[in-house]
Curated annotation (Swiss-Prot):
Its EC number is 6.3.5.4. This is Putative asparagine synthetase [glutamine-hydrolyzing]. ATP binds at S382, G383. One of its GO terms (molecular function) is ATP binding. One of its GO terms (biological process) is L-asparagine biosynthetic process. Keywords: Amino-acid biosynthesis, Asparagine biosynthesis, ATP-binding, Glutamine amidotransferase, Ligase, Nucleotide-binding.
């Protein structure tokens, strides 16, 4: 694991003949993500003013081959042993198998025992095809000293982030956007707010890839690679991972074999995700996903420690269930209870770590459980991705409920929406009629919706009706034409909710605490098995993740297997009606200088209505409040979070 930063200087650019100025700037910017890798840090450069070149910055969190796999990593064939230079964030879990294959087929020689050299040797011998062979989470930048090209890539699902900015001075890539913002004078990119991205954020509660809220900074999308040269105006980006859900029927003759296939691929994935030279723990909520991962992990580490979090308020904690699950599988368990005071105090620090606003309150308890876990372990496993791959969200059952509408003539179906409009809000059947009148492409755009069209117009002075969710989702839906509706919803979530919310908080919030989070469900081999499941093996009228539950019967304790999903719930609705969080909310709105972007009076009205109980605006308010806090930190600079730099033992 590490935080990486790479700068490809334009020819005759501002870097100077020796690259010393650029190296100094890169070192300063890299320190802003020290938390991603407190074990080692440094820079490396090969720049001359005439032809440009490259500068690397890195912060290493050493997990595998602690003693030898220092960054940047150098490797090459015998005739050019230092041809390639790599900075790498992530882990390659099948690196042992890849190294053996490269030795056997190509005679590759390795100088370390780590996973990074598998990327370098694989790239040399297989080219970009190496990306199809990697089982892991990764974002990396690889400099070829012969072609003078920077090759960057991200893992298929977007577990690890990579931001890109291009300007007159060259192109920079980084694990964290704040590092690029620190390099704006060196690179020379546009730092104005992207109003389209802001509207997308308000609709979705996160900024969808490849956008960011700064016009000059984009994200390399999940499953893509980029080629960057000093003599090019912009990176050349190519998608290498194109997910497909191609269902294969389950029959009475093969059903158990299909469930066994799921069990086997999960066992293999967890076994590989346990590869580390440090202690590995696990996050444990009250659900089947994290419990399954922990139950499989303890086979490889009988002293497994599990961690969970909750709140003091009744109904907002799964600690009791997690404790029972830990006891059932024989794991030691540690719980962190978060108070309202702690919650409020941590918000500026958390938003600074996030880089982009993510209006998901669950990332706050995640921050505290990650901080607690880091006292005991350096790596944790977690259950993210199971819902998207195996059909775990309740909304995936909606096509079953709306199936009768599919038989209506289109004009009649549309009229159902008009019938629903005059019905009172909250009236039984209103939402069903409205959503039934819409096509899947119109009604479903991931697991986030809080503002109606009218409400968006109220809070965004620059609202534009053409900047809707459809300009984010339409290209994705175009790829899934002809699939069953559940598969299409899963596919949308891979490109929206999963990589825009779930994996952003999973990466940023754990790395804020120098803790590596691994997600065994998001493995290419697991996806290959899950993608062949038919809709009926995922969703029924009574349950979700049907096939996964069947596959986990021998692994997950019975009290968890069919329990309703809760996750890490947060009592935002209650806390925004009284107490410290409400006071903080009024103060945040009152001091905000984002009035040209957000209608401050409209947000005040929502706060007042929510406080007195006439409306539940909690999700809408949280979306606005997190943006205002983000704006105060990164644009106004009126809020300066206190960022600690704790010293952790390298070996743990």
């Amino acid at each position: 694991m590490c935080g990486l930063l790479a700068f490809v200087a334009a020819p005759a650019g501002a870097a100077g003949p020796e690259g010393a100025d650029a190296a100094s700037a890169i070192a300063r910017a890299s320190h802003l993500m020290r938390h991603r890798g407190p074990d080692e840090s440094g820079t490396w450069h090969a720049v001359d003013g005439a032809s440009g070149g490259v500068v690397f910055g890195f912060n290493r969190l050493s997990i595998i081959d602690i003693a030898h796999s220092h960054q940047p990593l150098r490797w090459g064939p015998p005739e050019a042993p230092d041809r390639y230079v790599l900075v790498f964030n992530g882990e390659i879990y099948n690196y042992l198998e890849l190294r053996d294959e490269l030795r056997t087929q190509h005679g590759a020689v390795f100088a370390t025992d780590g996973d990074g050299e598998a990327i370098l040797a694989g790239y040399h011998h297989w080219g970009t095809e190496v990306l199809q062979r990697l089982r892991g989470m990764f974002a990396f930048a690889l400099w070829d000293t012969v072609t003078r090209e920077l090759f960057c890539a991200r893992d298929p699902f977007g577990i690890k982030p990579l931001f890109i900015a291009t300007g007159a001075g060259g192109t920079a890539v980084a694990s964290e956007k704040k590092c690029l913002l620190d390099l704006v004078e060196l690179v020379g990119f546009d730092t104005e707010i992207d109003h389209r991205a802001l509207q997308h954020y308000t609709v979705l509660q996160y900024v969808p890839e490849p956008e960011t809220l700064h016009r000059g900074v984009r994200r390399l999308e999940s499953g893509c690679f980029a080629r960057i040269r000093a003599d090019q105006l912009a990176p050349v980006i190519t998608r290498y991972f194109v997910p497909r859900f191609a269902a294969s029927p389950i029959t009475n003759d093969n059903d158990q074999a299909r469930y066994d296939e799921i069990t086997a691929v999960l066992e293999d994935s967890v076994a590989k995700h346990m590869r580390a030279d440090v202690t590995v723990g696990a996050f444990l909520s009250g659900g089947i996903d994290s419990t399954a991962i922990a139950a499989l992990a303890i086979r490889h580490n009988p002293r497994l420690i599990t961690f969970t979090t909750g709140f003091e308020r009744e109904g907002f904690s799964e600690i009791d269930v997690a404790v029972a699950s830990a006891e059932a599988i024989g794991a030691r368990h540690i719980a962190k209870v978060v108070s309202a005071d702690e919650f409020v105090a941590a918000l500026p620090e958390i938003v600074w770590y996030l880089d982009e606003p993510v209006a998901d309150p669950a990332l706050v308890p995640l921050f505290f459980v990650a901080r607690e876990a880091r006292k005991h372990v350096k790596v944790v496993l977690s259950g993210e991705g199971a819902d998207e791959l195996f059909g775990g969200y309740t909304i995936y059952r909606e096509p079953l409920s709306l199936r009768p509408f599919d038989y209506l003539p289109k004009p009649l179906r549309r009229s159902m929406g008009k019938v629903s409009k005059p019905l009172p809000e909250g009236m039984r059947g209103k939402s069903l009629l409205h959503r039934g009148s819409l096509t899947l492409e119109e009604r479903y755009y991931g697991n986030a919706r809080s503002f109606s069209g009218a409400q968006l117009r109220e809070v965004l002075p620059g609202f534009r009706p053409d900047w809707t969710h459809t300009d984010v989702t339409a290209p994705v839906y175009a790829e899934s034409a002809g699939w069953d509706p559940v598969a299409r919803m899963q596919h949308i979530d891979l490109f929206t909710w999963l990589r825009g919310d779930i994996l952003v908080k999973a990466d940023k919030i754990t790395m804020a605490n120098s803790l590596e989070l691994r997600v065994p469900f998001l493995d290419p081999e697991v996806f290959a098995v899950a993608s062949r499941l038919p809709a009926g093996a995922k969703i029924t009228r009574t349950t979700t993740k049907y096939a996964l539950r069947r596959a986990l019967e021998p692994i997950v304790p019975a009290h968890v297997l069919h329990r309703p999903k809760l996750g890490f719930p947060v009592p935002i609705r209650h806390w925004l009606r009284a107490g410290e969080l409400l006071e903080w909310a009024y103060a945040t709105v009152g001091s905000s200088q984002a009035g040209h972007l957000v209608d401050i009076a409209a947000v005040y009205r929502m706060l007042d209505e929510h406080r007195c109980g006439s409306s539940d605006h909690s999700r809408r308010l949280w979306t606005m409040l997190i943006f205002m806090l983000w704006h105060a930190i990164f644009v106004e600079h009126s809020v300066v979070p206190q960022i600690s730099e704790p010293q952790y033992p390298v070996q743990l």
